[in-house]
UniProtKB/Swiss-Prot annotation:
InterPro entries the UniProt entry points to: NusB-like_sf (IPR035926), NusB_fam (IPR011605), NusB_RsmB_TIM44 (IPR006027)
HAMAP family: NusB (MF_00073)
Entry keyword annotation includes Transcription: yes
The protein, known as: Transcription antitermination protein NusB
A GO biological-process term: transcription antitermination
MF terms in GO: RNA binding
Reported function: Involved in transcription antitermination. Required for transcription of ribosomal RNA (rRNA) genes. Binds specifically to the boxA antiterminator sequence of the ribosomal RNA (rrn) operons.
UniProtKB keywords: RNA-binding, Transcription, Transcription antitermination, Transcription regulation
Superkingdom per UniProt: Bacteria
Length: 154
């Protein structure tokens, strides 16, 4: 039963991470301090009185995705056939970055879980068409990871 609670908590942390990272598409953070400000200003965090120093799973996802964005975009571009990241919708791109980050940089998140959670985020924030697009890219990345043509960073 505890595992289910943890999964629910992680899912809500992913949603928070998505919202903060999505917002950065419109008001980019230039450094880690601005990234922390964006996190602490998000409604889910500020409604709880904010956090002096960001901690927890959501923050780890935000910081890791933001820090590794260039490498994540290279992976996404590789598997998004005939799509440049500039052409991918902001919602879809944010979800892809988060899920690919989890696949490659988080030893505690199996690729199948990263794919499933990416699809869940697309159900919550995207539209029906984006799910297939996201699933296709994430599945291709997972297969490349399994085949060893891309490697984990942890």
């Amino acid at each position: 039963m505890a595992a289910k609670g943890n999964n629910s908590s992680r899912r809500s942390s992913r949603a928070l991470a998505f919202q903060v990272l999505y917002g950065l598409n419109f008001s980019p953070a230039k450094d880690l301090a601005q990234l922390q400000e964006a996190y602490c200003a998000s409604p889910d965090v500020s409604d709880r009185g904010g956090e002096a120093h960001p901690v927890g799973f959501a923050w780890e996802l935000i910081e890791g995705t933001w820090t590794n964005q260039k490498a994540l975009d290279e992976i996404i571009t590789r598997f998004a056939q005939n799509w440049r990241v500039e052409r991918i919708g902001k919602i879809e791109l944010t979800i892809l970055r988060l899920a690919v980050y989890e696949m490659l940089y988080r030893a505690d998140v199996p690729p199948k879980v990263a794919i499933n959670e990416g699809i869940e985020l697309s159900k919550q924030f995207g539209d029906d068409k984006s799910r297939n697009f996201i699933n296709g890219i994430l599945d291709a990345a997972a297969k490349a990871l399994e085949a060893g043509t891309i490697t984990c960073k942890y």
